[in-house]
């Protein structure tokens, strides 16, 4: 209901609103009917990318370069001026194919989640933010990024269709980074405008929701995320970088698996290794993905290197995070003593309120 209300309250309302219901078993379809929102019904196994493609296919033919697609998740509520601000950022920038908002926590609305996203060479999702960072305007502005989350992304429709939409091998997770990478390789750019704000619950990533998409082997979010991260790197990188990237992926997976075992999380450890194994036994998927991307590539895929964190940056960030969490474990504040997080509380709260085992959890 909050998402539907947020769409209806936009200062610049969308020209058309289409919802896609992928086999929900709650009252979503009834809610959409009551709100008079056109909606499509797909099977529960459909991924986000294919759902968007189905929705776009119902639109009249694209006749203008100024036609845009605004994507929202069912757990992402836009501020009432979000669409207006996103459109303002691209009004005089014809080379921009994608723009996204600042993303804050759903309940803790001072918790800064994203101002653009990237991917590290070991497959880690990279936001450039501290795990418990609060929004004080320190990252505000309009600037280029590798990509933005699909929760709130505004995409030029002509470019979306020219690139073939999202890769349907990425049912969930990392489809945003992959699409942004392909946008850059096609000679276009991606922006963030922090004047636009979205509040996101990240229900799937935080494991509050079962992952039922077809590609989700064993329905494990971490397994799907790691597999998709490796797929994005192997299908988008230049061919001569593939051996090094493969070694980095294997090394990082082994290190994280060992860390999970020390943290007594064997399920997550197995996810790390199974993710790579799933790609190893299906090299045809990587070959097909590389061939598909090559058709629309106008510049070297290394154009996005400037948006990727260096190894030094990653190492320093990991050490700082580890130090902060050890300090929190040894010297807890009064607010951290005896606190229990219920299912209804914000799972996106600062890391200091989470279990120390989150040291090894993938960054969101």
Which role does the model predict for each range below?
Residues 5-14:
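Short, acidic, metal-binding catalytic loop of nucleotide-sugar glycosyltransferases
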